[in-house]
């Protein structure tokens, strides 16, 4: 039986995390991986598919699942709940798949209690300007939404040094290849360029 691997990827909104995960899953290396599908209470978007992107449920049902301790981890963000259920993860593990988790740092900590060998990857934007452009395009210049997302992004990156690997997404294909390298070699020194990352963090945290 093959040895399964478990990876959590975190990133501020608009950094390209979801696209990187989806593209990786369609590569030869990604064939043995599955994405752990989260539950959420937010509305489904036109391009999304129930059970593939998320399990979309009501807030009442989500709260019931919290009460019944059915989540490994959950969070409340921008007026909606998001969570990883024990059932989803156990079913994927039982099917002998390696797993990707799309969660924030608190989620990483909780999942690591359940799966100690979880490896965490944090993805940063190349610059604050680049991130603002992506957020602007995504949220149609809604100033209130932009400010909320940017405030959360500054909180997200404060935990960057608690991850196993840190990548700066300057180029999509290059970042994708680095994720593959992490999975193949798990060589931290080959990936983390600490001085460059620290300098990027300082710039990203500037007002």
Curated annotation (Swiss-Prot):
Annotated Guanylate kinase-like domain residues: 4-184
Record bears the keyword 4Fe-4S: no
Subcellular location: Cytoplasm
Reactions catalysed according to its record: GMP + ATP = GDP + ADP
Top-level taxon in the UniProt lineage: Bacteria
Keyword tags: ATP-binding, Cytoplasm, Kinase, Nucleotide-binding, Transferase
Predominant location category: cytoplasm
Binding annotation for ATP: 11-18
Gene Ontology molecular function terms on file: ATP binding; guanylate kinase activity
EC number: 2.7.4.8
Pfam families assigned to the protein according to its UniProt record, in alphabetical order: Guanylate_kin
Record-level GO cellular component terms: cytosol
General function of this protein: Essential for recycling GMP and indirectly, cGMP.
NCBIfam families: guanyl_kin
Family: Belongs to the guanylate kinase family.
HAMAP family reported for this sequence: Guanylate_kinase
Name by which UniProt lists this protein: Guanylate kinase
Native species: Wigglesworthia glossinidia brevipalpis
Lineage, highest ranks first: Bacteria, Pseudomonadati, Pseudomonadota, Gammaproteobacteria, Enterobacterales
